[in-house]
């Protein structure tokens, strides 16, 4: 059984690459090498866009917070009987709250009783290697402020226990990969004082927990996401400085970066190069970053990112579009691009050789299914009024439930604005059952 390193978020695609690659993808130009350094074929094929298809069902609400001023920001699913979610609540969004699923229902959990330092933690991550080993990572103050309050804790099956912080904790927790109580990788970083396309050394740092202390490891490039199937098969993705923007600008364009850990060390894997959309304007002022990685096997890895390129109107600056690519063990192949595809995050495998995004599913046959919104929640009157019908579902996290064709999402359902007394925001967990899964 493959271990998903991020709370069972990224693995379990179960051979998605072979199926999707044949029907969806376009080989990228440029020479790349596989994980063993071999030079593969660089055969190109015609680009494909996802074809429209019937709707893929709707999100179902599995949990809704009692508080009407709350939202969930992180989710980890160790199994279909063990899951955690973390969010913020309160008039000033000053309370961090935990909820736990035991296979029957979601219950509030008083994590503050276990973690006295728990306060307002707007930047949070959850990751798990299985029941009895779920990790929580939280940063208190907004990015770039002083006196950052951070908390790292581990659920051991009975309570949350504090874990020491890395010796030089930065102001942003990005992502984490958990393989066991004594094998955890943590990405941190900073966004203060950066020039475009240039990054401080903190952006190339990953911390490794060995059970007793954190070890600082320098990565070959900046990383924004990390995930893996096993302790000796881990991927990190992000960006690296590319060509200089122009002679008058010190910054450099961002280029995609992919890194692999084989149990001995980290090394760069030549990253995919994305073709600009057909509606892109002239010029080579293009950049791309990888925002997430979904590994399912040595020859089955998805990366998701964002590409910036000149728009058709030079006066309006650059446009952006999501990008996908698949690693088949020897080369990257560019995935489909379409206005139907949503942004790069959140994303999860669907257990049926496809990917699930916020509002749709990319199937193995290349078709795109729209996922409808969840049912309407009653507002503050206890009914669904005209005001309440404007409510929106926002998702911060998507996770495939291990060994199933279900994807769970965490976020909020909210309505209102402008200070209305009818405003509400409920933290929610929603479920999507993959059709035919």
Region spans (language model):
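Bacterial N-terminal signal peptides that target proteins for export
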Residues: 2-17
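Residue-level hotspots at or immediately adjacent to binding/recognition sites across diverse folds
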Residues: 29-437
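C-terminal motif of bacterial Sec signal peptides marking the signal peptidase cleavage site
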Residues: 24-27
